[in-house]
């Protein structure tokens, strides 16, 4: 086989692979999710919902007075991560725990205008607006895992609103990591189409 024939064959194979990667995901049927129930039907009697930055945010409040503790859960968790400590901690002041976007009973938009509600900056903005709407001027932020990252970013942007910062096994990077190709790949139309299956 001639060298040019081998190159043509490799080119055709690479072209077919590229075509499969670009078009293939759209050929996978994504049925509507069955058996979905509204978040309000799944909520506990002490659950509350507040419209924050165009999202219905699920949260709970226990206790009263100062200090105010705001509990930020980790990846794949929810307000229920904190249920064992909310009651005892409420003896010291007001405890607020909320479900960050994509977790628990907080709304999960599949489409949006502008910045993704799942971005780091949107998480900080949501916490700031949640505090504003509830009327909290300063708080002790308690962040676990990815919630620790949100707490730290919030402190860096709004130090005047943070009385103390408690980080529990935080997912905090000491060097800048932008996500690079992983973030780019997850934002492609192909991955957004397949997202509900994952």
PLM region spans:
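Residues at the starts of beta-strands that form the adenosine-phosphate
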Residues: 94, 138, 161-164
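Gly/Ala-rich beta-loop-alpha elbow adjacent to hydrolase catalytic centers
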Residues: 143, 147, 151
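Flexible "cap/lid" loop of the alpha/beta hydrolase fold
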Residues: 152, 156-157, 163-197
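Conserved HGGG/HGGXW glycine-rich cap/lid loop of the alpha/beta-hydrolase fold
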Residues: 55, 60-108
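Alpha/beta-hydrolase fold catalytic core
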Residues: 2-67, 92-93, 118, 136-137
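Active-site loop/oxyanion-hole signature of alpha/beta-hydrolase fold enzymes
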Residues: 52-54, 60-62, 100-142
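Short, hydrophobic alpha-helix immediately C-terminal to the catalytic nucleophile
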Residues: 80-83, 128, 152-156
């Amino acid at each position: 086989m001639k060298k040019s024939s081998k190159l043509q064959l490799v080119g055709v194979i690479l072209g077919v692979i590229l075509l499969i990667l670009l078009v293939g995901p759209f050929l996978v049927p994504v049925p509507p999710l069955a058996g979905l129930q509204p978040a309000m039907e799944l909520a506990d009697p002490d659950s509350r919902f507040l419209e924050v930055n165009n999202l219905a945010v699920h949260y709970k409040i226990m206790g009263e007075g100062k200090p105010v503790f705001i509990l930020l859960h980790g990846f794949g968790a929810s307000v229920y991560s904190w249920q064992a400590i909310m009651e005892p901690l409420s003896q010291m002041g007001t405890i607020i725990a909320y479900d960050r976007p994509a977790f628990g009973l907080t709304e999960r938009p599949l489409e949006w205008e502008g910045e993704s509600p799942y971005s780091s900056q949107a998480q900080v903005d949501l916490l700031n607006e949640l505090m504003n709407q509830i009327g909290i001027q300063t708080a002790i932020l308690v962040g676990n895992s990815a919630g620790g990252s949100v707490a730290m970013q919030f402190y860096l942007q709004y130090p005047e609103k943070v009385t103390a910062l408690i980080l529990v096994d935080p997912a905090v990077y000491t060097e800048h990591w932008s996500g690079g190709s992983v973030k780019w790949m997850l934002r492609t139309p192909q991955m957004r189409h397949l997202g509900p299956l994952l």
